[in-house]
Amino acid sequence: CEEEYMDYVNKGCPMVLGGPLGHVMAAKAIAFKEANTPAYQAWAAQVVKNAQALAEALKSYDIPLQTGGTDNHLMLADVTVYGLTGKQAEAAMFECGITANANALPYDKNGAWWTSGVRLGTPALTTLGMNEEDMKEVASIVDFVLKNTKPGVTKEGKPAKGKIVISDETKAAARERVNKLLGAHVLYPELDLDFLKKEFVK
């Protein structure tokens, strides 16, 4: 800042600055600038289109969705149709390279920890450049993973709400499909992934 304001600025920031951290404010400034561009608005519109396409694709596999669909970036799927809790579905998908969150449904019989649902969203997929057609494959992979996952048991042989049984073959087949999808939509195409794997992955 200009010298005449320097003392005031330095006393106000960071001397008496509380919750809003400087780097957070800077990040917000950039985010607001980006949000005011046509490219961001096109991305946001595609996020919703992808979410609606994913919702319809999931329903084609008879996966119930809370509210029957979505008009934003996410959806809540009831995974009890597979005989799984939300935690089990989350764990199974994670082992196959899919990130989702266990999420309670209204009046959830499994409670807020184990849950009966999973939350799926499309912002990250859209950032990768995926479109509505790709959402059909995402839904197909989700269905494949969940229908090939069984609830695990405790040491006493009782059903466990958090443990799963999923074969190595299922995981390998799902990961192959996930990798194929990601290979067609590389986030940083300019990076030499083979070099990075060779140098940094042990």
Identify the residue ranges that each predicted region occupies.
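Short alpha-helical basic/polar micro-motif
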Residues: A45, A91, K136
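Short secondary-structure junctions and interdomain/linker hinges
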Residues: V16-G19, A35, A39, L54, ...
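Generic non-transmembrane alpha-helical segments
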Residues: A53, A57-Y61, Q88-C96, I141-V145
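Residue-level preference for alpha-helix termini and adjacent loops
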Residues: Y8, G12-V16, A42, V47, ...
